[in-house]
Amino acid sequence: MNAHPNLSRPIRSLLRLIPIVTASFLGLLAQPPVVAGEASEARLPTIDPDYCGVTFPPNIAPLDFRIQEPGLSFEIRIAGAAGTPVEIFSRKPQVVVPIKPWRALLEANRGQPITIQVAAMRETGELDRFAVITNFVAPEPIDGFLVYRRLNWQFARYANGSIGIYQRNLADFQETELVRIKERNADNRGTCVNCHTFLKNQPDVMALHARVGTTGEKPMIIANKGTITTVAKPFGLLAWHPSGHLLAFSQNMFSMILHSVGRNRDVYDGAGDIGIYTLASETVTMPPKISLPDRFETWPTWSPDGKYLYFCSGPKLPVQQYQEIKYDLMRIAFDEASGAWGDVEEVLSSKTTGLSIAEPRISPDGNHLLFCMFPYSSFPGTQPESDLYLMDLRTKKYQRLDAVNSNRSECWHSWSSNGRWFVFSSKRRDGLLTRPYFSYFDSQGQAHKPFLLPQKDPADFYDSLPQMINLPELVTGPVPYGQRTWFKAMFAPEHRVVPKQSGETSDAPASMGEPGSPMN
């Protein structure tokens, strides 16, 4: 029977919604519960994720969170100096912020603080108000999309057939599969998608390393403004030259070292050399200065002006001495017009730091270099001690980013195109699974407290997702290539290139380890 026979269906629906959530800009008359009294807490409320004291961009999705305080119901008020506050009355601890008023509030408060007031209704009928959370809206936006890899953790990596490259619209919660490998499909068995990289944050110029289970090939797939090329040579870690004419790559042979007690695993790279792939001539060159027979070279990255190639280099020791291998940060001058290389320079020595160095990434203005340091090896993902460091390339001074790091592994970082944001993967949430975090990098060269990639009900999303999210790369728009494009390039390429060898070469093997094994 109709409980409200004299009311229209839209009005009846509205009445059911009003007690739960409302935003004040809507003009809906929602009344919070009647309370017997109020009390004030001197402390901040405990919320998950920890969105307290963070700086976020004006174009980020709502920072939904869960209140980890007892209460029969909750009141939340999000406000700034300008614009209309967002008010939410909820019977559940999950706080879902309406996206339209959230966007309007952030836009009205660029460069200004945003406060969050949380109150909990106790069983006594008393409303307990916590101290106000103060965050800050940066004036500069972040690139609109994030591209990352999702894969199952460690030994169950192919459960539910999950390894793939995804993109996420940072202004909302839309995630899109770019390519997903379903291992339970016999045609895909043994197939893997791995390192991906973009040319200066452009979504339509990218390279992707793959392994094709049916053929055993490990090609690099280049998507360049709609043209798809499958390069039939095993490349590892990739880096675009700023001109877009070249790709630096590493040749690696990763193997897993498993332990029965203590640290559960390590990664050993048994073959590290760096080479150059030239797109126009379809040639591969292994410059002798960066493919030395007695050194492991890896983690190539270019300076924004293209005049230097930065990389990491460590002594070539046998696997039994894996804990003794520490990598130095190096660079070498390069002239694109002539193809000439300068001499290798040491930028930062592991003997000076006492730590191994990996994953150098330079800010778009060329002034700062973000990198990882940890006790040994070239792989920070398996090292809980891995932290992010920042070097001022103008002075060569470096510092540990105390505001950013945790007591868990930090790695896989990349810059936004405007240099005001960087994203990285961290295991701080549970010690096992990498999750993407963002940090604001202000005009004074200071990195701010990071925040977790927003999700609808993020506590439930991250706690129930048994996958690592790593290799996060910021891009300025949506990637225009989907599943069909990548599968065709892997299994039935229209444009397949067998690159010609040019100049002196290294004899080091060129293969990656098991798909996803060390890539965490």
Model-assigned labels for residue ranges:
Residues 2-19:
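Bacterial N-terminal signal peptides that target proteins for export
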Residues 16-28:
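Bacterial N-terminal signal peptides
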